[in-house]
């Protein structure tokens, strides 16, 4: 439940975070940087699915009929390309997740993204650990892996060079990030 998906949408391919659920639980702590960062992540996910996916992608079953259930989606159409992809091919390093890698480096350079220092005193850890959806035994390993992936992406990217994306439309995503950041 780290993304606050509710049971109603859990079986769907598109699972938007339930922002009200998050705010009910942590709204009183939004001034804390880690809670605010968590909320920003969920809000960006929500907007990405709600505002971007709905305009650019359609999902189909094996009979090429519209489909929303995760287990039944077989094909993905990228509307501006008028191209249909096999689901496995679409969600691959060549296409969708490859674009993520290229965008991560671009956005990290553009917005000077850095990982925070994770050395906290006991009182800070107490506040941070109030986020019960995080597996705190696994968190350090996940952070190190994510930090390494981002560092690797940034290292191979040329600063100032706009990445050649296969699936995503970068100017729209930049606008989405900026609009979302203003709402946090």
Residue locations for each model-derived region?
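N-terminal leader/auxiliary helical segments
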Residues: 1-184
């Amino acid at each position: 439940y780290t993304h606050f998906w509710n049971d109603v949408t859990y079986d769907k391919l598109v699972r938007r975070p339930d922002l009200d659920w998050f705010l009910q639980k942590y709204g009183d702590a939004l001034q804390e940087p880690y809670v605010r960062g968590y909320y920003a992540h969920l809000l960006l996910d929500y907007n990405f699915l709600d505002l971007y996916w709905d305009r650019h992608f359609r999902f189909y079953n094996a009979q090429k009929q519209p489909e929303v259930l995760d287990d039944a989606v077989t094909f993905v159409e990228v509307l501006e390309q008028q191209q249909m992809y096999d689901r496995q091919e679409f969600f691959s390093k060549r296409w969708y997740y490859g674009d993520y890698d290229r965008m991560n480096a671009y956005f990290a350079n553009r917005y000077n993204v850095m990982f925070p220092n994770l050395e906290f005193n006991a009182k800070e850890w107490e506040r941070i650990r109030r986020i019960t959806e995080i597996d705190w035994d696994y968190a350090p390993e996940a952070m190190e892996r994510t930090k390494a992936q981002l560092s690797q992406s940034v290292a191979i990217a040329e600063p100032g060079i706009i990445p050649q994306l296969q699936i995503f439309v970068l100017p729209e995503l930049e606008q989405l990030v900026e609009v979302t950041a203003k709402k946090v």
